[in-house]
Amino acid sequence: MNQSTTIERGKAAGASPFHAGELAVQRRAGVAEHADAAGRIGIRGFMPEQHRAFFAQLPWFIVGGVDADGQPWATLRAGEPGFVASPDPVTLRVAGGALRDDPLADAWRPGAPFGGLGIELPTRRRNRVNGTVAGLDGAVLSVAVTQSFGNCPKYIQRRTPEPVAPAWPAVPLRRASALDEADRMLIARADTFFVASANLDPDAHRARGVDVSHRGGLPGFVRVDDARTLTVPDYNGNRYFNTLGNFVSNPRAGLLFVDFERGDLLYVAASAEIVWDGPDLAAFEGAQRLVRFRLSEVRRSEAALPFRWSAAEYAPQFARAGAAG
């Protein structure tokens, strides 16, 4: 029996990998038994070799964290493949890659929670890794892994990146308390966004920390209700409910919208409310529930992403679901 098998069996027989908020959502959705069985096997305390190799081949990496005020943010880092690496199964190293205007630029210190998502748009592969910052060495961030698990390829739009030189001179960061017309248009045509959430309750044990996840749909799946309110459908996923479970414990959320054509990054701080039923559900085909985000801050960093992407090839699930999350 190898070390990985020993770890897996010990974990499966031990405590649940989920915290109270995740368990509450699983029970309400009627999937608690399924999630418990799947989570005990699928959520590891180490990265398998396949994930370690996958992260090392990526030119970008989605990151979630919290700032000094406890606000979660979803952001990203970019670099030559290999800038994210893993010297051993329980350590992830991110060597630089921070972009200008990164809302988490000053957030990293030993013990800080870290959520990571490796996503490869051309192949629709994605894997998650969570942990805490173990150390800083200049621009290198070292993360001690507490949770590692894969996600299925559903709802990911296929795109191919092309590197570009950074825009110069850089346009100053725009900060506001509400969306302007350009922001609303970006969100209205978005087919992808990323969301960071957090549960920092010590009682959450190894489920404590930050999650950052992907959401995808056809353009218009994020409804702009007004300049400070967004409504998003929640569709069938892995049934772990990491993000929604965090919202039960802590409604603060950080959203990241990427303009794949221009390279703009739109960072949104918000408070999340889960809408379990009601007439609004009918407006979103196939939605099992909704999430309503009430915005408190908006930051737009123009042409910050050092890639431009090909037109989207939409995920095959949309032929059945219309939109998805």
Question: What are these model-derived regions, one by one?
Answer:
Residues 1-325:
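Binding-site signature for planar aromatic cofactors or substrates
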